[in-house]
C-alpha cells in the first residue's frame, strides 16, 4: 500500500491485510461468519470505485438479466466461506460493500482491493464447503471410522482424490456421506447455481478490469 502497488486480497488475505494496516479481526467472528451465497450491498464509495464499481455494475446487470434480485441495483450475490472476519477497518481504508451478517466485506486502501468473498469460486466448491461444515457439525455423533469414511468420500466427490480407492480413501464412495451432510451440500450447490450468472460476470469483469489497469 505504501509503495502504491496494485494488489488484490481475498478472504483470509483481506483479514491479514486489515491487521497489517492497523485494522482488527475476530477469530472466530461469531455472528459474522458466512458460508454459501450472500448478497452484498454496495456503498456510495463502492459505486464510484474505479475497479469495484465497474465490476459490481456488470454483476448487477448479469443478475438482472437472469432474474436475480438486485434491490434496485444496490445488491448482488457473491460466494463466501469464512468463520473469521474483519471487525474494524484500517484508518486509511474505505468500505465498498457489506453483507447483512458481515458489515466489513469489500474495502480499499490505496491500490489494495480486499474481498471477504471468493470471486474465483463456483457451485461445486460451495457444495464442498457446506458438506464439509455439515460433517464437522455431525462429528460428535459419528464413530471415528464412519467420520473418516465420510470425509474421504467428500474428498473423492470433490475431485481432491483421483477416484474411489485412491491412496488414503480406502474405497470411500458417496454412500459413506451422511444424508444430512449430502443434502446440505446439494442445497448449497443448487443455490449457487441459481446465482451463477452474476458470480461469473463478477469474476470475468474483475479479471478484465485488472488486466486493463495493469497495462494502463
Q: What do the PLM-derived regions correspond to, one by one?
A:
Residues 22-125:
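Pocket-forming structural segment of enzyme catalytic cores
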Residues 9, 13, 18:
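Gly/Ala-rich beta-loop-alpha elbow adjacent to hydrolase catalytic centers
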Residues 1-9:
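Flexible gly/pro-rich beta->alpha loop and the following alpha-helix that scaffold active-site loops
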Residues 20-21, 130:
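Hydrophobic aliphatic residues
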Residues 8-9, 32, 194, 198:
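Generic, well-ordered alpha-helical segments
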Residues 120-216:
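Acyltransferase
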Residues 21-22, 214:
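A broad structural signal for alpha-helix termini and local helix breaks/kinks
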Amino acid at each position: 500500500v505504501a509503495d502504491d502497488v496494485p494488489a488484490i486480497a481475498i478472504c483470509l488475505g483481506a483479514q491479514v491485510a486489515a491487521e497489517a494496516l492497523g485494522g482488527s479481526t475476530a477469530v472466530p467472528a461469531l455472528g459474522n461468519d458466512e458460508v454459501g451465497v450472500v448478497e452484498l450491498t454496495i456503498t456510495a464509495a463502492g459505486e464510484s470505485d474505479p475497479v469495484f464499481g465497474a465490476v459490481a455494475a456488470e454483476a448487477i446487470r448479469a443478475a438482472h438479466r437472469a432474474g436475480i434480485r438486485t434491490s434496485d441495483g444496490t445488491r448482488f450475490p457473491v460466494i463466501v466461506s469464512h468463520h473469521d472476519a474483519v471487525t474494524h477497518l484500517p484508518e486509511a481504508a474505505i468500505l465498498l460493500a457489506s453483507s447483512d451478517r458481515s458489515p466489513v466485506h469489500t474495502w480499499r486502501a490505496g491500490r489494495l482491493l480486499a474481498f471477504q468473498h471468493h470471486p474465483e469460486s463456483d457451485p461445486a466448491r460451495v457444495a464442498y464447503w457446506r458438506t464439509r461444515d455439515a460433517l464437522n457439525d455431525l462429528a460428535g455423533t459419528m464413530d471415528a471410522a464412519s467420520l473418516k469414511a465420510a470425509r474421504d468420500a467428500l474428498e473423492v466427490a470433490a475431485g481432491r482424490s483421483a477416484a474411489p480407492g485412491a491412496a488414503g480413501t480406502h474405497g470411500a464412495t458417496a454412500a459413506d456421506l451422511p444424508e444430512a451432510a449430502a443434502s446440505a451440500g446439494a442445497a448449497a450447490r443448487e443455490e449457487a447455481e441459481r446465482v451463477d450468472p452474476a458470480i461469473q460476470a463478477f469474476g470475468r469483469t474483475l479479471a478484465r478490469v485488472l488486466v486493463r489497469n495493469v497495462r494502463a
